[in-house]
Design a protein with these regions (language model features):
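C-terminal outer-membrane/trafficking sorting elements
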Residues: 699-779
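Hydrophobic h-region of N-terminal signal peptides that target proteins for export
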Residues: 13-21
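Short loop/turn segments immediately following the C-termini of beta-strands
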Residues: 207-209, 315-317, 372-374, 422-424, ...
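Trp- and S/T/G-rich repeat-edge/linker motifs of beta-rich repeat architectures
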Residues: 110, 114-190, 210-298, 305-309, ...
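N-terminal propeptides/leader regions of secreted preproproteins
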Residues: 24-127
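Sec-dependent signal peptide recognition
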Residues: 4-10
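Entry beta-strands of beta-propeller and related beta-repeat scaffolds
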Residues: 201-204, 307-313, 317, 365-369, ...
Length: 779
């Protein structure tokens, strides 16, 4: 009996650390604790609020010495103190050695007290009362994989001279040889970053190795908080070589020695998929200014189309260091002629320099785009541009509206242009901005002194914390059923790096873990009506606020947001759903594509990463592999919660986000993002989703693999198989069906000379072991 009393006392000491001591700093006299009969009603009431499983899980995570049987007994003891007198007997039978168990509890009591007091309340806040949408069983979906980032390198190790990059992709034989020599497959292309439909063709553009963009200040470096990563680092999912990379030394270092750190950033690619033929062309331009601008480019973040011209644009790479080199890269393509018109850095739009772009919008037959700009007075802010050009002179843009924030999203609602503003420019608030009524002739050019558009909502009105609003951005504007919807992007992967900058040296300390959990945010989801009345659909009634900037104390408080969510908690109920990245209306329903960061946490927690903090957070939050990958949600009614079409990236857990939607015919095309360059199915994917208007079931998705990529280059066409198999033949026919040429493949490629067909349109048929693909081609 004495042994049990000691056990109860030790347990009570740990339990009360989270219940009473955190409230009034009360202490418990262990000598007065005789057993369950001594538990006051006040304490038992508080204990009822403590979820047993999560409390014991915290103790287990923070002390791996706690064996499974011990944790079962500990769970029984907690339940016993709550008044469940049968729970203890059931658990005690598995732990006959009470003395050994008491030693473990003593150890835990000495070590875990600060974690129970500082970490456990935030842990409970994050995990409790979360429900997620149901799976959609009311429609039939057919989902095909149309294209995917090629394996374009075999990675042998950081700085290894054998790490040779081939943007056209490697053959099956080359991949097999590299694997046999101890290498790993690598997908350098990460995001399908911009996408647009032109008739029956889908155009898209990419970025590469996104977690490494910006060199050592890149987003992925937050997985190594406080460490020097300038020589590169690697975990089980991705690698950044930085200044050790051979590509950087040969390409970026040739421009300036300081640019070697951008070794992981390759030239982005541009593709065109013909939905009628099933063939995709790599239309990336080359030579002269094209090469220069593609090299000095973080990636092509956007694609837009109007009056025969397709635009691709993105921020400069070397400009990410700020200063005079800040700029952008834009490319114009003649969709009718099938050739590029030119490129431009957009550095002089009436004296204003464009530094970033994300979205385009066509309204009343007028093309607009939203940008970040350094205006001619040197101010960093946002602008809406209108296109006045044509194929002969595509670079005619005018500023038709100013905003205090970078224009990240834009669309027309209720006769006005609405903007999703990012706090990356002068106005450090993420917000929704409303422009003036759009006249019949469209928005007109304005001078630099024209008043900025009105801000109607800010994220800071919801989140009162001092830090998290700075990395939570407006995302995905979409009009649906008479209201404007948007989500948020919570760049939570930067939190570990922020913790290091805030002076936390030991990332496993209770203070550091509390900082990481307290700053963690999930995407909230909103809508507004024509009277600017804002509703919170998914979000929080309370959010953690860090007290140190206010009082100097490293503590946390839950503060009311002023909103009550209609459908559930932020993240659509998921802890690591950080981004409502893009939206589209399809068959009258609202589709929402997300980014889920669980696989990022898993990678950072891997053995190669070496930071125990990530593993602790992973174990606390219950990260599971079956949840890896983006979510796609379908909203059929504004008054009902959405349902999941998928919550695991269509079965590809490495695809962590949906970046783009576009409609072509009766299909929804989905462009995904994955920065996991060392994973077998890493890199971007292009999916096609077809949904019957009326359906009764969800069928297992079928996958249609892309057959052929091709690229025109120097009077020739280079064909390569999308899956790496050998090309058997390439046949050329005239439009009457007569054979003009048959060429045999060389491995997974085949090149034909197009000089004999100059000025003609022919039919080309490519045959591989997997099938054949035919298309008309004009030369």
């Amino acid at each position: 009996m004495k042994m049990k009393k000691k056990l109860f006392s030790l347990l009570l000491m740990a339990v009360t650390a989270v219940t009473l001591s955190a409230q009034e700093q009360k202490s418990v006299n262990l000598n007065e604790v005789e057993g369950i009969e001594n538990v006051s009603e006040e304490l038992r009431t508080e204990l009822e609020k403590v979820p047993t499983d999560q409390f014991v899980n915290l103790l287990k995570v923070m002390n791996p010495a706690l064996k499974s049987a011990d944790s079962e007994l500990l769970s029984g003891l907690v339940e016993y103190y709550k008044g469940n007198t049968t729970a203890l007997a059931a658990a005690a039978s598995s732990t006959p050695d009470y003395e050994a168990f008491i030693d473990v509890i003593k150890q835990i009591s000495g070590q875990v007290g600060p974690y129970v007091q500082k970490v456990f309340p935030l842990y409970l806040y994050i995990m409790n009362n979360r429900t997620i949408p149901d799976m959609d069983i009311y429609a039939k979906y057919d989902i095909d994989t149309i294209a995917a980032a090629p394996v374009d390198e075999i990675f042998y190790g950081i700085g290894d001279e054998r790490n040779n990059y081939n943007p056209m992709g490697l053959s099956e034989a080359e991949i097999a040889e590299g694997l046999a020599q101890g290498g790993q497959v690598k997908h350098n292309q990460a995001y399908l970053w911009g996408m647009v439909t032109v008739g029956s063709k889908v155009y898209w553009c990419t970025n590469t190795n996104y977690l490494c963009v910006g060199g050592t200040s890149g987003l992925g470096s937050n997985s190594k908080p406080g460490e020097d990563v300038s020589k590169g680092y690697k975990n089980k999912c991705w690698v950044c070589e930085f200044e050790s990379g051979t590509y950087g030394k040969k390409v970026h270092g040739a421009v300036s020695p300081e640019y070697v750190q951008y070794s992981d950033t390759r030239m982005p690619r541009i593709y065109c998929y013909d939905t009628k033929t099933g063939m995709a062309e790599d239309i990336t331009p080359s030579g002269g200014d094209y090469d220069r601008m593609l090299q000095d480019c973080q990636g092509l973040r956007s694609a837009g189309y109007h009056k025969g011209v397709v635009f691709f644009g993105g921020p400069s790479l070397y400009g990410s260091t700020a200063g005079e080199t800040v700029g952008s890269s834009f490319f114009a393509y003649d969709a009718d002629a099938g050739k590029f018109i030119g490129c431009n850095d957009m550095s002089n739009i009436d004296g204003n320099k464009i530094t970033d772009i994300r979205r385009w919008c066509v309204h009343n037959d007028i093309l607009y785009c939203g940008v970040r700009v350094t205006d001619r007075n040197g101010r960093d802010r946002g602008a809406v541009l209108r296109w006045y050009g044509d194929k002969e002179n595509p670079w005619q843009f005018k500023v038709v509206g100013w905003t205090a924030n970078e224009v990240a999203e834009l669309c027309v609602f209720n006769g006005r242009m609405y903007v999703g503003g990012w706090a990356t420019a002068s106005e450090k608030r993420n917000c929704i901005v409303k422009g003036p009524m759009i006249p019949t002739r469209g928005l007109q050019p304005v001078d630099i002194d024209e008043p900025e558009w009105d801000i109607i909502w800010t994220y800071n009105s919801y989140d009162k914390n001092s830090i998290s609003p700075n990395f939570t951005y407006t995302a995905g504007l979409q009009v649906w059923n008479g209201k404007l919807y948007w989500g948020m992007f919570c760049a939570s992967y930067i939190i570990p790096g922020l913790a290091s900058k805030m002076g936390y040296k030991d990332m496993t300390s209770p203070e550091a873990l509390a900082f990481i959990l307290g700053q963690l945010r999930q995407t909230s989801f909103w809508r507004v009506n024509s009277r600017d009345n804002v509703e919170l659909l998914y979000g929080e009634e309370e959010l953690p606020v860090w007290n140190r900037p206010l009082t100097g104390e490293d503590t946390w408080s839950l503060v009311k947001t002023g909103y009550t969510p209609i459908f559930g908690r932020a993240g659509f109920g998921q802890v690591f759903t950080a981004y409502a990245w893009t939206m589209a209306e399809y068959h009258n329903d609202l589709y929402v594509g997300t980014m889920n960061m669980e696989n990022l946490l898993d990678a950072a927690a891997s053995e190669e990463s070496g930071n125990q903090m990530f593993n602790i957070v992973k174990l606390l939050t219950g990260v599971k592999e079956e949840n890896y990958g983006f979510e796609l949600l379908r909203w059929t009614s504004p008054n009902k919660a959405p349902r999941y079409v998928t919550k695991n990236g269509f079965g590809n857990g490495t695809a962590y986000g949906i970046r783009n939607f576009t409609l072509a015919g009766d299909d929804l095309y989905i462009g995904s993002a994955s920065p996991f360059n060392l994973q077998k199915y890493g890199g971007w994917h292009l999916f096609r989703l077809h949904s019957d208007a009326i359906g009764t079931s969800v069928e297992t998705a079928t996958t249609k693999e892309l057959g052929i990529y091709f690229r025109r280059y120097n009077g020739a066409v280079i064909f390569s198989s999308a899956n790496g198999e050998d090309i058997k033949t390439v046949e050329v026919f005239d439009l009457g069906g007569s054979s003009l040429e048959t060429s045999e493949g060389s491995g997974n490629t085949c090149t034909i000379d197009t000089t004999p067909y100059s000025g003609r349109t022919v039919v080309v048929k490519v045959t591989t072991a997997r099938g054949n693909w035919s298309a008309k081609m004009a030369f």
